[in-house]
Amino acid sequence: MNSRVNKQVEVRELGLIGYQEAWDEQERLFTRIVDQKLSNRTLPHQAQQLTPNYLLFCQHPHVYTLGTSGHVDNLLVDQDRLVNELGATFFKIRRGGDITYHGPGQLVGYPILDLDNFFTDIHRYMRLLEESIILTLADYGLDAGRIDGLTGVWLGYNDDSPQQAGPRNVGPPRKICALGVKASRWVTMHGFALNVNTDLSYFNHIVPCGITDKTVTSLAAELKQPVSLEDVSNRVRQHLADLFDMELVEKTLEPHPQTGQ
């Protein structure tokens, strides 16, 4: 391993982008990092190059994705109806977790990181992703947390112990952020999906994350008003930078044809 590390992370805002296109971009950046790591193994120490890191933020048109450990039975409608009636697409992908929904109004984050630049611990990595969302929700006055044995971020997470409940941590357990990652050679891809202004009716057509006895929510649903996605994105990235000791570098991209911005 290269003993020098790179804490810089290039942030890219992709706007509203098709799932396949975003997946291709993840794969391209992932491969770039892995190829550099493999190349470094063949070079003397002084010639080795620092590996890059990326943080992608986007929204997707309506799409359902199924992870490697998921069950297609958790998709409750046939794929023809998905396309023809719901205007959605469906992908089987190589990440952990079961089935989830992505759509407009949801903040999706894809960290493409070389964990050799930070720490080589996948469990810690996932917990820090969750923590960045928990801290972001706290900025809006919401007391979010984790549920033992389940990934993601939840409200009502300790509903069985009302005496421990904090502000707005009331009601049944409901998921506000899904998490699913892949890592190879300590390089990560995929990430998290935070429901901000999401149309939650699209979750009615799946068993979200394969969990039958819990529901989903969004920031807008909890606060009873729409929330600036840009503001949420800025808060998430700052918490990620603090938790991972990152130096964020903004990358200006050409306007995406689906968004014009």
Per-segment meaning from a language model:
Residues 107, 184-198:
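Conserved phosphate/anionic-ligand binding catalytic regions in large, soluble enzymes, centered on
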